[in-house]
Amino acid sequence: MQSTSVCIIGAGPGGTMAALRLAKDNIPFVIVDKDEFPREKICGDALSGKVPHIIRRLSPEILERFEEKCKPMHSFGIRFIAPGNYVFDVPFIENYNAEKHPVPGYTVKRKLLDAFMVEEVSNIAGEKLMTACTVMSIEKGEDGFIIDTSSGQIQAKMIIDASGAASSFKAPYPKPEPEPKKTALAVRTYYKGVKGLHPENFIELYFLENILPGYFWIFPLPDGLANIGIGIRKDVVLKKKINLSAVMDEIIRNNPLVSPRFRDAERLGKPAACRLPLGNPRFRIAGERYMLAGDAAHLVDPLTGEGVGNALYSGFIAAEQAIDCFNENRFDDAFMLAYGQRIRRVLGKEMSISTNFQKMLKYPRMVKWIAKRADGNKHIPGLMSSMFTDLDHRKKLLNPIFILRVLMNR
């Protein structure tokens, strides 16, 4: 049996970020993952500005190596397509200037991102990184946990569980399954040769009437590729008996804004499916000697489906909470509340806004009315851009009266 201060379960973005942050303060850890890397990971492959921001905060040198090795495509905004074919281009940073602004976002295959992060951990952790290692069960002891794995037992004073929402091992702490209304089902595939991609690599979100409250997406990737997919809330899929692959193909073949762009495109491989635990968890994500991070904490953005940035942030925050625990020699339930409070402070407002907008998407007539009012409204693009950079504007967007006044040009 090997002993360590922190056992990190899961070597995705949340787990590897936690490991790298712990290493900066020389906190011993072991990180385990059931997979070998590089691995395929079903994802939209779009990384918001949170990703370069938090990696740069950890280490500017790591961000430089990421750009050099993975060669991600820089993405500068989002193109929203609303019912009625209203199109809104929203830059991540208004009046972007490369000389003074940081990179606003990326698109890159998750396979490359995850492999890069694991390599960074491997360089500092050596044999403490255990891949192809399955967690069988976890038992709570007086001074921590015993983690039983396919490669032997690990004794740890703390656990950071970044194993996702569908892990099968038995744990001595609550880890609720996502409810249907708090889960999105998604299908994605890759195409080569899609025409009409935005010159500044805006990702495209199509909020089409027949798939609300979900959306169809087109995300440009390096080497002339595009990630194409569709995501809809699970309860809606079950109620309407929606075949996501069939609906995606129907949009590609027949939607007037989409189909001409795919006329000469080639699909690469079969569609793949995944589920996303949508954010704003109402359960405890930390307790005595444990924390949940990333998808295990249900931190996927309810509107956009983005999870990588939130996973990286939660891994970083979990590691800093663990550092505080060892500095203060406190691992009790009350002390661990600080982790959940910090997650809510950093990510909570944004997820509340996304939740409210996602709920609104259930009403196509309302969405159409808003899109019609917003069309040509000079305040809308700037207001939406400010959501990505200005916390005060995010708070205002929680107020429906403020939104109504903007739509009415008041």
Describe the role of every protein-language-model region.
Residues 137, 153, 236-321, 327:
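FAD/FMN-dependent oxidoreductases across multiple families
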Residues 41-84:
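N-terminal FAD cofactor-binding segment of flavoenzymes
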Residues 120-261:
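Predominantly flavin-linked oxidoreductase catalytic cores and closely associated redox partners
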Residues 7, 23-43:
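Glycine-rich FAD pyrophosphate-binding loop
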Residues 1-14:
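Beta1/beta-strand and adjacent pyrophosphate-binding region of the FAD-binding site
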